[in-house]
Amino acid sequence: MRNQIFRTVKEWLLDSGFNIILDDENRRILIIEKEAHGIKNMILIVSDSILIMEQFLFEVKNPTEKIYKTLLQKNRDIVHGAFVLDNTGRRVIFRDTLPTDNMAQNEVMASINSLGILVGEFTNEMIEMSK
C-alpha cells in the first residue's frame, strides 16, 4: 500500500507518453523525459503526502540583479510551478509540488506541461541568462 501513489503516478506518466529514465520504487523517485515538450531529466519524488517535481534549466554564469528580477517577474506568468535557485544561487530549477491526498492525473500533467509551455515561451531569455 505504501507505494501505491508511486505506482499510480508512474502509470499516469506512461499513459501520457513520457519516457521513464529512472524508476526507483524503493526511494520513490522517477526521472522522466519528453524532449519534444521541453522535459528532460525531470525528477519526481513521491512521498505519502506530497509529489515534488524538479528540472534543472540552466546555470547563471554572470549573475546580475536584472537576471534575478526577470526570473521573479516570469514566475508570475508560470501557471504551475516556479523558478527556484539551488544553494549556490546560480542553478535555476523549475519546481512544483502537489499534495497527494486527492491528487488527480490532470493536475500532475498540468504541472509538467506548465514547464513545457515555459520552455517554449522563455527559451531565448534563458539562453541569454546562461551566457
Short names for language-model regions:
Residues 1-39, 77, 84-86:
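Charge-rich, low-complexity N-terminal segments
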Residues 27-30, 50-51, 90-92:
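Hydrophobic residues embedded in beta-strands of well-ordered beta-sheets
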Residues 34-59:
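Long, continuous compositionally biased terminal/linker segments
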Residues 44-49, 107-113:
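Extended Gly/Ser/Thr-rich low-complexity repeat segments
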Residues 52-91, 97:
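Short, internal acidic amphipathic alpha-helical interface segments
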Residues 80, 84-110, 124-131:
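Well-ordered alpha/beta subsegment
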Residues 117:
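Long, contiguous binding/interaction regions
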